[in-house]
UniProtKB/Swiss-Prot annotation:
Pfam families: Macro
Taxonomic lineage from the root: Eukaryota, Fungi, Dikarya, Ascomycota, Pezizomycotina
Purpose: Highly specific phosphatase involved in the metabolism of ADP-ribose 1''-phosphate (Appr1p) which is produced as a consequence of tRNA splicing.
Protein name: ADP-ribose 1''-phosphate phosphatase
Record-linked SUPFAM superfamilies: Macro domain-like
Domain of life: Eukaryota
Entry keywords, A to Z: Hydrolase, Protein phosphatase
Record PANTHER family: ADP-RIBOSE GLYCOHYDROLASE OARD1 (PTHR12521:SF0), PROTEIN C6ORF130 (PTHR12521)
EC number(s) from the headed UniProt entry: 3.1.3.84
GO molecular function: phosphoprotein phosphatase activity
Family named by the database record: Belongs to the POA1 family.
Catalytic activity: ADP-alpha-D-ribose 1''-phosphate + H2O = ADP-D-ribose + phosphate
Name of the gene this protein is made from: poa1
Listed PROSITE patterns: MACRO
Domain Macro: residue ranges: 1-201
Length: 201
């Protein structure tokens, strides 16, 4: 039976991302260096240390055995007749998503299990964070990769539940939320986006 494409939706609420229901997947943006040292990533590391170890090992794997994603960068200035499609090499895991299943060490003393989804949108962090245009391009690639993986996981009845997200990229990466939100809106999936109660719309 052929599946019909559905339009995704985003519901924005105020609260605590970590209050997501049992089985939910929590989405945040990550650097490719293996550090969850600041912002909401630091809270992820404290609450899900086993998931952090998987993320860190994933980054280290590509550090010592580099692999590259070849992607085309289509012209986005229609008034520029000289623009042409160019191929770009991106060093993994940049531009991809890592979906980490609930880890027993992270949920054994809690009443809820959470999946963790890492979107690799910046190569580095701090003063070496990627420029906003690169982060958004990586976000497009990473979200597309996440969507492919989620469709596969749901087909396998893996138990992955609702998709909950922070306003990723808008904190320490310094990218306006509206730009990342647009990428989610075009993904075809449904998301609950949580912002802290003290954060303005």
């Amino acid at each position: 039976m052929a599946s019909k494409a559905t339009q995704g939706s985003i519901k924005e609420i105020q609260g605590d991302l970590f209050d997501a229901p049992d089985g939910a997947a929590l989405i945040h943006a990550c650097n490719c260096i293996g550090s969850w040292g600041g912002g909401i990533a630091k809270a992820f590391k404290q609450k899900y240390p086993a998931a952090y170890n998987i993320y860190h090992s994933h980054c280290q794997k590509y550090k010592f055995s580099p692999e590259y994603l070849v992607t085309s960068d289509p012209p986005n200035q229609p008034n520029n007749a000289q623009s042409s499609t160019r191929n770009k090499e991106i060093q993994l895991p940049e531009g991809t998503a890592l979906i980490i299943p609930p880890q027993e060490k992270d949920y054994k003393d809690k009443d809820k299990k959470h999946w963790i989804i890492c979107l690799f949108t910046s190569r580095n962090y701090g003063k070496r964070v990627s420029p906003p245009d690169v982060i958004i391009r990586n976000t497009e690639l990473a979200v597309a990769d996440m969507v492919r993986q989620i469709h596969r996981l749901r087909a396998e009845e893996s138990g992955i539940g609702e998709l909950w997200s922070c306003r990723f990229n808008s904190g320490l990466f310094g990218v306006e939320w509206v730009l990342s939100k647009r990428v989610l809106e075009e993904s075809g999936l449904d998301f609950v986006v949580v912002r802290p109660v003290d954060e303005d719309e």
